[in-house]
Amino acid sequence: YAYRLNMKKKFEDFIKKYLPGWAILPLLTIVVLNCLIYWGSDQLTSARYHYDFTGTLDRMVPLVPAFIWIYILAFPFWAVNYILAAQRGKDQFYRFVATDLTIHLTCFVIFLILPTTNVRPEITGNSWSEQMLQFVYAMDGGNSPSNLFPSIHCYVSWLSWRSVHKSEKIPEWYQHFSLIFAILIIISTQV
């Protein structure tokens, strides 16, 4: 029982230190709005023509299934960095949230006006990476993906880096890591 109480206390201390109460509702709003925009725009445009944005570069770049792990790790990376954004103080955090919500709503309008798709490369192997890639493809529209332009993965990754960049409260090594990981996430959307 004492162990559970100690763990609960550590968790509460962690939350107090990294996630101020005033940041919880804005962060939940971002999560809910992201889901509504992503799946809502998909539903609203499902019967409409989707413009194929598969370009020459897309056809030239080979599929690298191992990058699916970077793509998946984007989700906890975003969560951590969005929480760390609160370390910059209330005013800067609210500006960060306003930027995120503005970009999300802009994406929503673009998704509705210009529904897009692309041709996904065929997955021929059966490695763990290829199986995970097939799973993600199935979760994300199968052979008919949508909401591809602009890329929410790319902008959220960039914004995640910006949330910690030049922050006195975030270690410099983590700021550099965030930049590198954000770039890897952006690459993962291409390969």
What do these predicted regions represent?
Residues 6-78, 129:
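N-terminal transmembrane-helix/juxtamembrane module of multi-pass inner/ER membrane proteins
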Residues 14-17, 58-65, 88-91, 140, ...:
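Juxtamembrane loop-transmembrane helix junctions in multi-pass integral membrane proteins
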Residues 35-36, 104-112, 180-191:
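Aromatic-anchored segments of alpha-helical transmembrane domains
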Residues 46, 114-118:
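Short helix-capping/hinge motifs at transmembrane helix termini and TM-loop junctions
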Residues 68-81, 105, 153-156:
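Hydrophobic alpha-helical transmembrane segments
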Residues 80-113:
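Interfacial segments of alpha-helical transmembrane regions
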Residues 118-142:
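Membrane-interface interhelical connector segments
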Residues 135-191:
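Membrane-embedded catalytic cores of phosphoryl/pyrophosphoryl-handling enzymes
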